[in-house]
């Protein structure tokens, strides 16, 4: 009995903590599916977590991780910002953003003299030609219908600018002429004439006389009033002399 029990105990495996079971092997399809899910689910963050796990498994990994974290801010931007890493799907918005930044330059159309004459002739008739007129004109001048339509749009804008400038200049000229006419028609008050100092001194000396005193040495031109006063004074003087002379002559009886 003892030998049989001992043999049974030797055949039974010993119970205790053993090594973990190995991971299941993945085929090529499983690897592709795992890589696809990996790239969609924030590739960069998951790679950092896996790298941190591998560093923790090695001795001295914490010191190396600290040194790498200290060098990363001073070293500049990470490689993930400069270029996509291996396995990262390129963003579809990068190419479109670069294309939007490069603004396409539109080719300008140069019209010759014959084309401009034909376009101006039609513009004199109508400022808004319909599609049939534009197509016919485009065939005549060897241009596209879109170019003809753009030319008419620009020509209408230029015509409106010229009209506004003409109206502004005309209104300014009318306002200027009206202000000049109003200034001419406004009555002007007569200015008082300045009195000469000779007249003021004469009125102060003889207030009752209306004729200024005659001065023989004056070189000014004689006025009619002054001549009349002089003649009256001379006549009076002669009459007085005649009366004196007649009174002195003795009478004969």
Curated annotation (Swiss-Prot):
Which source organism?
A: Homo sapiens (Human)
* Name assigned to this protein: Paired mesoderm homeobox protein 2
UniProt-listed GO biological process terms: regulation of DNA-templated transcription; regulation of transcription by RNA polymerase II
Q: Which PROSITE patterns match?
A: HOMEOBOX_1, HOMEOBOX_2, OAR
What keywords would UniProt list here? Developmental protein, DNA-binding, Homeobox, Nucleus
* Superkingdom, natural source: Eukaryota
Note the DNA-binding span(s) on this chain. 104-163
Sequence similarity? Belongs to the paired homeobox family.
Q: Name one GO molecular function term.
A: DNA-binding transcription factor activity
Where does the UniProt entry say this protein principally localizes? Answer: nucleus
One Gene Ontology cellular component annotation?
chromatin
């Amino acid at each position: 009995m003892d030998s049989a029990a001992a043999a049974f105990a030797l055949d039974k495996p010993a119970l205790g903590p053993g090594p973990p079971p190995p991971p299941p092997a993945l085929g090529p399809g499983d690897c592709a599916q795992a890589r696809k899910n990996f790239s969609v689910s924030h590739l960069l963050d998951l790679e950092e977590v896996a790298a941190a796990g591998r560093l923790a498994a090695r001795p001295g990994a914490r010191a190396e991780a600290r040194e790498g974290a200290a060098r990363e801010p001073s070293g500049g931007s990470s490689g993930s910002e400069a270029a996509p890493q291996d396995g990262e799907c390129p963003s579809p918005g990068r190419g479109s953003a670069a294309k939007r930044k490069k603004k396409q330059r539109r080719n300008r159309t140069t019209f010759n003299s014959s084309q401009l004459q034909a376009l101006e002739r039609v513009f004199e008739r109508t400022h808004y030609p319909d599609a049939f007129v534009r197509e016919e004109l485009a065939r005549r001048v060897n241009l596209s219908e879109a170019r003809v339509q753009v030319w008419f749009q620009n020509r209408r804008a230029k015509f409106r600018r010229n009209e506004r400038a003409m109206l502004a200049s005309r209104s300014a000229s009318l306002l200027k002429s009206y202000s000049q006419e109003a200034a001419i028609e406004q009555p002007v008050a007569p200015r008082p004439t300045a009195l000469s100092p000779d007249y003021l001194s004469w009125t102060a000396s003889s207030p009752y006389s209306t004729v200024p005193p005659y001065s023989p040495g004056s070189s000014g031109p004689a006025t009619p009033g002054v001549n009349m006063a002089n003649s009256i004074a001379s006549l009076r003087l002669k009459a007085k002399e005649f009366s004196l002379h007649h009174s002195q002559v003795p009478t004969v009886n």
